[in-house]
């Protein structure tokens, strides 16, 4: 298989990952305003898509962390090769699609890093091909600290918002004015998501071009066509709406009120924007989840569903190693040459087809997002359900837990 064809296939696969990142992470910006009724579902995701598109053009610091820092190299060469980039993307896409199907808000970013790390180590048989200082300083430590920081900021902001408006307690309109603020704050989250997450795919494609000798290693910044393609891919994915994960963040962790949602969104946006300028490739999903939990704790009459929170945390812990294992396995197959690459591509296509076919059997759409569309979710880490002709509905539980089978909405 020619190098040019491999590069084209990997670029297509990278843009598909960017697309999945869009619908997987739509919830980060729009789950809480949809939950409180500040925005209707379809206009919300359209707004998020437009702002993700704009945000992708605002910075390239995170892209350079991936293309010029994580994978070691010598001179104009890097340890990773185009087939290994393909293998890493298969690992990332596999975990991204599975967690989306299970309704678990896991990290698309860590799935990508895990896939690339596993593919590089197995493909080169050299654990030293990874720059662990960059891995720890720019990825792992921010991943551990960012949800805690965002949660503390959201907790404090929620307390402050309720204290400042305490005279409105008991009124019919209560704190509904915060719904207007949510439109602004959720827009800021969507913009910041574009500045952070779109860059990760830009970095992967740039890394691919460097590994193929099509771009000097000293020029780690993405080319203009890479920026444009990634911006369009993530915006398109965002517009499709990741309704399963929107439901988990909007309903499954805590009952979200307008003031609380506003505090969570502003905390999320502030954390993401600050990290983007510092080149930290953190997970916007973890930040958003931490903010929602913090805001739930900040409300005196609020509570957090710790069972759901625990399953989300388990998903966070599994993301990087599982994606690395899949990336490593596909990298070992890629070592077979052209036949190995074809097998890897077939694996990717099979995973994509199976996941979307299962999703089609029990779809979650924008119709399920309105406040009265369905009964409150007992545990929004949703099990998959499908009906076979003549059979009772069977539940296929996710690794995140089987309690979600209690949610049985009508097929749209």
Over which residues does each language-model region extend?
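Multi-pass alpha-helical transmembrane bundle typical of ion/small-solute transporters
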Residues: 1-412
């Amino acid at each position: 298989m020619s190098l040019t064809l491999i590069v084209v296939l990997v670029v297509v696969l990278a843009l598909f990952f960017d697309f999945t990142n869009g619908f997987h992470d739509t919830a980060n910006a729009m789950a809480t305003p949809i939950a409180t009724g500040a925005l209707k579902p379809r206009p919300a995701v359209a707004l998020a898509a437009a702002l993700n598109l704009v945000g992708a053009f605002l910075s390239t610091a995170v892209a350079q962390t991936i293309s010029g820092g994580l994978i070691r190299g010598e001179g104009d060469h890097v340890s990773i090769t185009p087939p290994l980039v393909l293998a890493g993307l298969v690992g990332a896409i596999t975990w991204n699609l599975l967690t989306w199907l299970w309704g678990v808000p896991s990290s698309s970013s860590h799935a990508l890093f895990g896939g690339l790390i596993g593919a590089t180590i197995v493909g080169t048989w050299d654990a030293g091909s990874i720059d662990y200082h960059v891995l720890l300083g720019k990825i792992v430590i921010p991943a551990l600290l960012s949800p805690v920081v965002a949660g503390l900021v959201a907790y404090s902001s929620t307390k402050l918002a309720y204290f400042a408006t305490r005279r409105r307690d008991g009124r019919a309109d209560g704190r509904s004015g915060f719904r207007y603020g949510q439109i602004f704050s959720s827009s800021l989250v969507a913009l910041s998501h574009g500045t952070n997450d779109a860059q990760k795919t830009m970095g992967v494609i740039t890394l691919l071009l460097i590994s193929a000798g099509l771009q000097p290693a000293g020029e780690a910044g993405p080319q203009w066509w890479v920026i444009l393609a990634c911006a369009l891919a993530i915006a398109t994915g965002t517009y499709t709406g990741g309704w399963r994960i929107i439901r988990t963040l909007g309903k499954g962790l805590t009952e979200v009120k307008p003031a609380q949602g506003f505090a969570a969104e502003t905390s999320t946006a502030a954390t993401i924007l600050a990290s983007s300028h510092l080149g930290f490739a953190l997970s916007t999903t973890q930040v958003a989840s931490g903010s929602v939990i913090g805001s739930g704790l900040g409300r005196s009459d609020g509570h957090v569903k710790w069972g759901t929170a625990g399953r989300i945390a388990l998903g966070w812990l599994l993301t990087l190693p599982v994606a690395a294992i899949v990336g490593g396995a596909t990298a070992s197959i890629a070592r077979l040459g052209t036949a190995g690459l074809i097998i890897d591509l077939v694996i990717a296509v099979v995973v994509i087809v199976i996941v979307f076919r299962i999703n089609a059997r029990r779809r979650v759409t924008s119709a399920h997002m309105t406040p009265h569309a369905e009964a409150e979710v007992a545990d929004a880490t949703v099990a998959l359900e499908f009906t076979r002709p003549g059979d009772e509905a069977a539940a296929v539980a996710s690794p995140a837990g089987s309690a979600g089978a209690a949610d049985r909405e009508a097929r749209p």
